[in-house]
């Protein structure tokens, strides 16, 4: 009888035992309502990693001008997406899946420009008595404008909590992982849906950056180019030919010189071909994928009478991506 009671106690203890390690997925965020569009834009253009003006007063002034010039247009975009960004609900669904697949850790997320902010999430983790943290950048390639900005925000939030000092590890890039690239390639093939790949120009579209950011030492362009070369190698290994495989940059803002070629330019250049686009710099769908690529550029493709225009979804909350994240975390070396 004592043995049975002991086993029951062990089962109860295991069932109620809380994870001591948390994995925080870091991303830019997106408006959770039309009201939050202004909050999102204000926070983004007040970020010194985005608007690299050293003088705080000047940065805030220029940022306010940009926000005022873009807010109504941005609201119309989010109206077409159902009144909010899809990024937060998809990320929530991903963490739900992660927690079911790996109950030994607690998976959550923090956004850079909209709630839940890192400060809010870390306060909650402190109450949960978490002993170890993994900050996981949801951007496959590293950039000061995304990865570094998110890490800086998360570490500053952590420093502000004087009594919460967990062990911290980071995952700052993962584009070179073959498992990831196999998932990407499968996503492309699923989108083709038995169409002949050799009939299509495959465009890997990534978020653009001002050339000045790259000239200052940001490795983003180099990593995007390397990522495409790795995917090309994988396609050759698996004998999956495309008419052409190209890299392009989207979402240019303002009069500055940005990375080229633009996605629009490549769509127009290959107007006589079938086109399939994969959003290589994003893991979660957002306005740049669902509106810009799938609505705005689709209209452009229709005007150009392009034979066929396909847009691949991001990895989102797929079980394949969730298992990939868990694998990265489990294989992360202690520092």
From Swiss-Prot:
Compartments, record wording: Cytoplasm
HAMAP family named in the record: Ferrochelatase (MF_00323)
Lineage of producing organism: Bacteria, Pseudomonadati, Campylobacterota, Epsilonproteobacteria, Campylobacterales
Keyword entries, A-Z: Cytoplasm, Heme biosynthesis, Iron, Lyase, Metal-binding, Porphyrin biosynthesis
Pathway in which this enzyme or protein is active: Porphyrin-containing compound metabolism; protoheme biosynthesis; protoheme from protoporphyrin-IX: step 1/1
Any one of the GO CC terms: cytoplasm
The name this protein goes by in its record: Ferrochelatase
Chief location of this protein within or outside the cell: cytoplasm
PROSITE patterns recorded: FERROCHELATASE (PS00534)
Entry GO MF terms: ferrochelatase activity; metal ion binding
Recorded family membership: Belongs to the ferrochelatase family.
CDD domains for this protein: Ferrochelatase_C, Ferrochelatase_N
Record gene name: hemH
Its biological purpose: Catalyzes the ferrous insertion into protoporphyrin IX.
Pfam families in the cross-refs: Ferrochelatase
List of residues binding Fe cation: 207, 288
Any single biological process term in GO: heme biosynthetic process
Enzyme class: lyase
Reactions catalysed according to its record: heme b + 2 H(+) = protoporphyrin IX + Fe(2+)
EC numbers: 4.98.1.1
């Amino acid at each position: 009888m004592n043995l049975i009671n002991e086993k029951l106690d062990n089962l109860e203890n295991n069932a109620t035992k809380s994870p001591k390690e948390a994995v925080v997925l870091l991303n830019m965020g997106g408006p959770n309502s039309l009201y939050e569009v202004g909050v999102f834009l204000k926070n983004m253009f007040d970020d010194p990693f985005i608007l690299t003006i050293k003088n705080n007063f000047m940065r805030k002034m220029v940022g306010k001008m940009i926000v005022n010039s873009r807010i109504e247009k941005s609201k119309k975009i989010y109206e077409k997406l159902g009144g909010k960004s899809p990024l937060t609900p998809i990320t929530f669904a991903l963490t739900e899946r992660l927690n079911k697949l790996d109950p030994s850790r607690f998976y959550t997320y923090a956004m850079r420009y909209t709630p839940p902010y890192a400060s809010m999430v870390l306060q909650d983790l402190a109450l949960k008595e978490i002993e170890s943290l993994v900050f996981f950048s949801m951007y496959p390639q590293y950039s000061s404008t995304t990865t570094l900005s998110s890490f800086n925000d998360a570490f500053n939030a952590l420093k502000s909590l004087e009594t919460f000092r967990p062990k911290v590890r980071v995952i700052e890039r993962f584009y070179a992982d073959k498992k990831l690239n196999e998932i990407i390639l499968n996503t492309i093939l699923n989108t083709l849906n038995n169409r002949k790949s050799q009939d299509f120009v495959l465009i890997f579209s990534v978020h653009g950056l001002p050339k000045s950011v790259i000239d200052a030492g940001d490795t983003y362009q180099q990593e995007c180019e390397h990522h495409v070369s790795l995917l090309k190698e994988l396609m050759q290994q698996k004998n999956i030919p495309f008419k052409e495989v190209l890299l392009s940059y989207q979402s240019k803002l303002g009069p500055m010189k940005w990375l080229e070629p633009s996605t629009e330019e490549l769509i127009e250049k290959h107007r006589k071909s079938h086109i399939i686009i994969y959003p290589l710099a994003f893991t979660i769908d957002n306005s740049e994928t669902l509106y810009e690529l799938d609505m705005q550029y689709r209209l452009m493709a229709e005007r150009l009478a392009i034979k066929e225009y396909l847009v691949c979804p991001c990895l989102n909350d797929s079980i394949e991506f969730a298992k990939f994240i868990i694998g990265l975390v489990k294989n992360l070396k202690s520092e």
